[in-house]
Amino acid sequence: MSKIFILNSLLLLSQISNPEAKFLDLKNKLEKKGFQVIIALPPKRGAYGLLREADKKIWINPIVFELGIGTRTLIHETVHAAQVCAGKGKIKTLGLDIQPSNYARPFFRHYTDVKRQDLERQAYAVQTQPNSFELAVSLLQKHCK
């Protein structure tokens, strides 16, 4: 089963037009922490990325590579992965002292659930930092032992 999954993942990655080295590095780091990164349409319609905390699966919509936002999308989902680790399997905020850029606000303000809005605010805050990759990696290492 896992050999088939790995082969399918490699096949999908080979079809992606030159995924960034940072994307592949982050994908490997997530997988070493027990997350499964799947390049396929997420179960939630219209999502670019999705983390299902129950089984630590992360879907990345293949369209993000055509849009040039593959790494940014995985950075966002990496923050959610760190949130799951921090909550010991239940997603929780990390208490970060950074704010998202103004252009990102509409992407999380539409959530009516305050907890979900806070979780998304943190993910967008990290995603929009100039050092977003390094910040996401440090959060993953800090919270996912």
Predicted regions and their residues:
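N-terminal targeting leaders of exported, membrane, and organelle-targeted proteins
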Residues: 2, 15-19, 73
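Sec-dependent N-terminal signal peptides
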Residues: 4-12
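Metalloprotease/metallohydrolase-associated module, dominated by Zn2+-dependent proteases
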Residues: 18-45, 91-145
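Post-signal-peptide N-terminal segment of Sec-exported extracytoplasmic proteins
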Residues: 44-53
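Acidic/histidine-rich, surface-exposed loop or edge segments in extracytoplasmic proteins
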Residues: 53-60, 105-107
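Short pre-active-site segment immediately N-terminal to the catalytic Zn-binding motif
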Residues: 58-74
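Alpha-helical architecture
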Residues: 74-78, 118
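Catalytic Zn2+-binding segment of zinc metalloproteases
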Residues: 78-95
